[in-house]
């Protein structure tokens, strides 16, 4: 009897094993490679080819496949100050955002996670990732979904517990379509092809323009975006009161159902998150520097108002040479 029971048990185990194995999803294979930022062929790194800028920073490329999409992500950590924010740059064509993130991680510490559009290493950058097995290109900031869990796990691998502050950085096209707004005036200076402006109000966005509109908020495309649950007040959004007290341009994002963005993902999980945006001003030095400077100014405000991480105020890079003071005649 005992022998027969043992045989039946073994047969049952053989039948169940394949089914059980099918329920276990293997961990995604990730290729992690240390990289030298001074020899990288991508435009983001080429523009920052200064050895002093990268001292104390550790740079790795992380490659993996999640569902139908192949991803290439760069992780930049401040080795001296690893406990700062998680700086997220999802769109490869938003060049000022990448530069601001590198300067911010040098000053405030933490980790930069920047998505490289995997097919454009030898060509113009794109905000979308077209390296897919099938279907349409994927927006890196619309991929925080239940059916792509490995993507979120990889992007937020350094989040920690308690979670560190997440600061997402973006640049976007100028202006907006006034026809899409319920409150904005139809003026030539505000019309454009963008989707982000503190003059835009809709079911999704509730604007709070800066009262003084001093730089960098003289540009209505330079804003902080704070998400809040659709059945609650905008004041419940992370750090919303403090940012309003700082007289920032703020767009309150009303979230009823997730759109796959990191702002929505963070809201539903109670993570500290702020999104900073400014107008894309191209890749020429003057325009790139202007957009970068506006992002850095807003970063300073967020770090002063919303973060417990100690750090020096951001300084413009490269530093301007100091001129000797004029001596008074004796």
Label each region the model flagged:
Residues 9-10, 20:
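Cleavable N-terminal signal peptides
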